Amino acid sequence: MSASISSLIKHPLVFRGRDHRHSNDGGEVRLPFGQANLDKACAGGVPAAGAMSIRALAGQGELQLLNNVLLQKAATQKRIIWLPNQLYLNPNWMSQTPYQQQSWVVSTSNEADAQWACEQAIRSQACCCVVMYLAQIAPKAARRLQVLARQYDCLVVLVHPGYRSPGALPVNIDMELSFDTQQWFVHLHRVSGAWPQQHITIEHPLPAANSAIVNAFRQYSSSSATAIHEVS
């Protein structure tokens, strides 16, 4: 009897209420970042439902790190909500993404309104993902968004500097993006289904040092290369 019930529950047409997403084998669905070292450390990627925290400065490459995850969420054809919270979200970058048509940018005047808008987007069940920029996030607020996002099958990404959050936040993944003179790293302060790790090397679109700028100046420093820029 128990085997029959288990088989029935796993049927894709059976609604399982507030249960978060599972794969066909009963495991939790995880979305890979497309970074081999990071995906291995995160037990395959970020859980498809729930909240994750990225401790990074805006424009540090956090969106490129998320790109593969957002592409997978966009396959649901639901909305992706962006809450830049008074930060400038480059429309040129947005127009070049495959999920541009699904993306809505919501402007708010303060962080309290941004968090309220985030909760409403989750509850609407019309959104597959919410990306919210904050100056800081309290553990209690992060926990609230984690519970709501798992309940309504939504991925919430919290991007914040992290200076005022010394401990790990109660979310699926709490990661920090950092670099030294030669390499970019991710530090995992918390990860569901695996252990925290430090100094996970990743491929990053931004150079960790200014060597790329130096090489560019050196390349175009000759008179033949700069002739087209000369005026008389």
Question: What role is predicted for each listed range?
Answer:
Residues 38, 54, 130, 149, ...:
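Conserved RecA-like P-loop NTPase ATPase core
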Residues 126-166, 171, 179:
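A contiguous pocket-lining binding segment that forms or flanks enzyme active sites
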